[in-house]
């Protein structure tokens, strides 16, 4: 069979015809449990010796179909679907980290990720080392034999900083650690994480995949590229499971125990979202670039940050890693916090909301919301400015959005 294009793979997969009734859409198996013909069959399923479903906190046919769809279009060795992006992050690091281990990352993180590292993991004896990931020497100074991972957001939110992934991958692998990346800002067809040395990818499927802001979800993609015999915590499993060692630990223990598996209803909705993701993204990203270019001309706007602008300091690296349209999120600075609030309050078309990559364009003031519980000192260390507005660009026309922005800036 000929290799299908990415666009075709979003709509058609080799296992589409597995349903006994030939449904064009994957049925929703809205069940908690499954019946077995014999006690022996039940034992085999619960011990993981067969592929039969035992309980929907562990696996479910609808969720499994969604996972296979993602696996097909990304080439990942395995995909685990959970109920949020934060569930994906916590499941990964409870799988990898142990007391005495450290994680090397940037302070430029989503607020809850930062809090998870700084507070939750610290309580388990895991050290988090913050450094400038755009500076290889600063990273090398932080990694050591106890580093269990280097973690980053491929385009930070809301700072829009970009680090060289191949360089970070080389540093991580040299120290026997995987490179883990949150790639939520750029979808699969724009950025192929494994080609840049990413071993484990995190995606908040709430965003581009869902599209309509109807459901929460998070994905863990394991590309099977890391040698887990180098991992202090997982090396004892490496001989048995090889490239699948991380996934084996995750699926057999952590994900079962934390109970954050995706629900079948969400998997169904997000499977539908996958089918239109490429079409939606093309419009969103093109409009985002137009807005960034036009915002630069407005006198009330002090600065515009979008890595697709040629004037952006990360433009060359961003283009190399993500192409000409690096996501549908931009930020811009106004004169003050008060000016930001006046702008937000005057918006008529653009919605005031916290989500990203909805079909609708959304505006937020990150310093007072996502980072509102942080101290001023913490916000400064994370480069979160009180003068910054973040826009997540939707499917409206650029002209309609510019009209709303212009009237709100008056």
Regions found by a protein language model. Give the residues of each.
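Short conserved active-site loop signatures built around small residues
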Residues: 1-29, 220
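Conserved PLP-enzyme active-site core in the AAT-like
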Residues: 10-16, 78-299
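Conserved N-terminal alpha-helix of the aminotransferase class I/II PLP-enzyme fold
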Residues: 33, 38-90, 112-119
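Short loop segments at secondary-structure junctions
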Residues: 33, 223-226, 334-338
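Short, solvent-exposed beta-strand edge segments and adjacent coil->beta transition regions
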Residues: 50, 267, 274, 325-329, ...
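PLP-dependent enzyme catalytic core of the Aspartate aminotransferase-like
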Residues: 100, 118-119, 127, 145, ...
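Short hydrophobic/aromatic beta-strand micro-patches
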Residues: 221, 331-333, 392-394
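Conserved small-domain helix->loop->beta segment predominantly found in fold-type I
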Residues: 258-260, 276, 281-283, 288-360, ...
